Amino acid sequence: MEETETKRKFLEIVKEFGLQHKSVNSYEYTLPNAKPTDFLIFYNEDKDIIYCAKKLRSDYKDYINNYCDWTFGFTGIVYYKTNRARQRVIKILKQYKQHLNKIKKLEMEKDFA
């Protein structure tokens, strides 16, 4: 399959945020240090869309059942056909990366205490 603009943008985001491949057989990525069930960003080659999902609940079944079209409630799917959707994906990634950095910093401080 040829490389589309959407796929190129997706791969740029993967590189920019240092996302890690979650599944060998698909375009599923997650942030380093994140639990794979906490945050995922996907590229769907058949539909040529990018979407991401972030979990609210600890129950994985709830996570799957609570996808929605894009209510910014931190479960949801972003369809990556517009620049606004791209900006939201990047905003979520930045927020989540900050969250992970805070956790890492707290753990380091705890280790030194």
Task: Locate the predicted segments by residue.
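Negatively charged, low-complexity tracts enriched in Asp/Glu with abundant Ser/Thr
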Residues: 1-33
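Short amphipathic alpha-helical segments that mediate assembly, nucleic-acid/protein binding
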Residues: 7-10, 85-89, 99-102
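Intrinsically disordered, low-complexity regulatory segments enriched in Ser/Thr/Pro
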Residues: 35-87
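Generic detection of long, well-ordered alpha-helical segments
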Residues: 3-4, 83, 95
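Residues that form generic nucleotide/phosphate-binding pockets
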Residues: 13, 92, 108
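Surface-exposed polar/charged interaction patches
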Residues: 16-20, 92-99
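Short acidic, low-complexity intrinsically disordered linear motifs used
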Residues: 95-113
